[in-house]
A protein has these predicted regions:
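Polytopic transmembrane helical bundles with strong interfacial aromatic enrichment
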Residues: 1-145
Length: 145
């Protein structure tokens, strides 16, 4: 589900769907496609959605990699990762929804913060999140012991 949500938000940026408040606040029709895609995680709400997506990728990796572990231990690891995921999902749902709508829709967006209009935005947050969020797996293993 987070992958679908992330792809829908990315599509909203690609299509310049300014009825989505997050898109209207972080993009405009003159922004190059490269930066529109990078803008998906360029602010708080999209960044949290990327965080949840990466957490799910790590969780699936732990589930696949943990098949050889004792069943009870593996269940505890999956349970801890599930609780972490539920916490982030609740946070994004109640405080940072990237799909809030603007009614009426904006004619054009505000633009991505000029400081973020750098090619590094395309790789820095995803790589950073794969490292940060990856620590949820050893945390889950430590709690499961």
């Amino acid at each position: 589900m987070p992958l679908f949500s992330f792809l829908v938000l990315t599509w909203a940026f690609i299509q310049n769907d300014f009825s989505v408040a997050y898109v209207a606040n972080n993009s405009n029709s003159a922004l190059p496609l490269f930066y529109r895609i990078s803008a998906v995680w360029g602010a708080h709400e999209g960044s949290l959605l990327l965080w949840i997506l990466v957490l799910n990728i790590w969780s699936i990796s732990a589930i696949i990699g943990g098949r050889h572990l004792p069943e009870l231990f593996n269940a505890r690891v999956i349970g801890v990762l599930g609780l972490v995921s539920v916490g982030f999902l609740a946070f994004i749902l109640f405080t940072s929804n990237p799909f809030d709508r603007l009614i009426p829709a904006a004619m054009d967006g505000r633009d991505l913060n000029p400081l973020l209009q750098d090619p590094a935005l395309a790789i820095h947050p995803p790589m950073l999140y794969f490292g940060y969020v990856g620590f949820a797996v050893p945390f889950a293993f430590a709690i499961a012991v």
